[in-house]
């Protein structure tokens, strides 16, 4: 259980004391399921007041519970979309200041996420939050597969922990399967969200080619992008099927 405590302590502001443990990579999706369940509870309870309020409250909660780290990743990577030169991108992504690109990217990611959530009813939105958050963490984990770090630091540590890819991937994917089984009545609608894993991995691969590696910001952005795409795919399936 040290790996789970380490994951909760590292990724969230939940007051759990634990050192960074190598087994943390086995608990990415469980951490996502926990935070997703918390966000879903907020969404469900506030949706009876107003759907938009519920969406804003739950997304705000997710930004805060992760200590603003993933939101910061969106801001950091956002500015790099404004330039094409790889070396300039590396300088910009490490810059503590944020420009137009970061602000626009931030609003695109989170306004679309809020808009998508506001289109669900209380039950659908709650399920979508749990699943999309779990898949988001799985996408972050998979972003480390066949990757190297260009900046050192925490990304290099996590990539070194990903030394048993099949075992780690299988264990994390079991959590997603469990969620599908719990919400089996909605499996036809929710299974399309798995496509977001492929799309977000393609995004990571694209960024890795540009930067000649990845860092914590790319990993964090991949998770936020995966959540958005998951919600979009779930919403489309609910509307069309």
Swiss-Prot record:
EC number: 2.7.8.26
Annotated keywords: Cell membrane, Cobalamin biosynthesis, Magnesium, Membrane, Transferase, Transmembrane, Transmembrane helix
Cofactor: Mg(2+)
The protein's annotated pathway: Cofactor biosynthesis; adenosylcobalamin biosynthesis; adenosylcobalamin from cob(II)yrinate a,c-diamide: step 7/7
Pfam families linked: CobS (PF02654)
One GO cellular component, as annotated: plasma membrane
Major location category of this protein: membrane
Function comment: Joins adenosylcobinamide-GDP and alpha-ribazole to generate adenosylcobalamin (Ado-cobalamin). Also synthesizes adenosylcobalamin 5'-phosphate from adenosylcobinamide-GDP and alpha-ribazole 5'-phosphate.
Family designation: Belongs to the CobS family.
Name of the featured protein: Adenosylcobinamide-GDP ribazoletransferase
Originating species: Picrophilus torridus (strain ATCC 700027 / DSM 9790 / JCM 10055 / NBRC 100828 / KAW 2/3)
